[in-house]
Amino acid sequence: MSEEVAVDSMEYDVVVVGGGPAGLSTAIKLKQLAAENNSELSVCLIEKGSEIGAHILSGNCFEPTALDELIPDWKEKGAPLNTPAKKDIVKFFLTEKLSFGIPFASFFAPNFNNHGNYVMSLANFCRWLATQAENLGVEIFLASQHQKLFTKTIQ
């Protein structure tokens, strides 16, 4: 005797896989573009972690140009960019407890100049981006393990 298994299905115009900075930014931009064009667009984001940022383990020195374009009023919306990078130092660790630093001359490598950037927790930033996405109508599903994604091409 064979048993039929009930399959839950949900339909969205766009499914974004992954709740990191790229996936969240994509979902936000899609909803912004839909709003600019007075069009309805259903967007969901699926994340394998139990919460947004659960698998983001690093800190970050964040350059905000892309965020200025994506969410121009990010400061007013409380983005967790509270610690400006004030100086660049290269630190040499001789042992676990003994180190010394030397100022980094950014004219040798201008791409490493962090003036105007922020030191932050990338996980906290992703959680903030998720809130912005939800405010735009993106549905976020956490701890998601999906077996199959059905796609349909629109002609």
List where the protein language model places each region.
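N-terminal FAD cofactor-binding segment of flavoenzymes
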Residues: E40, K48-K97
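A short, basic/flexible loop-to-alpha-helix module at the beginning of a structural domain
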Residues: M1-E11
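N-terminal Rossmann-like FAD-binding beta1-loop-alpha1 element of flavoenzymes
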Residues: D13-C44
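Glycine-rich, histidine-containing beta strand-loop boundary motifs that form or position
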Residues: G19, E47-G49, L142-S144
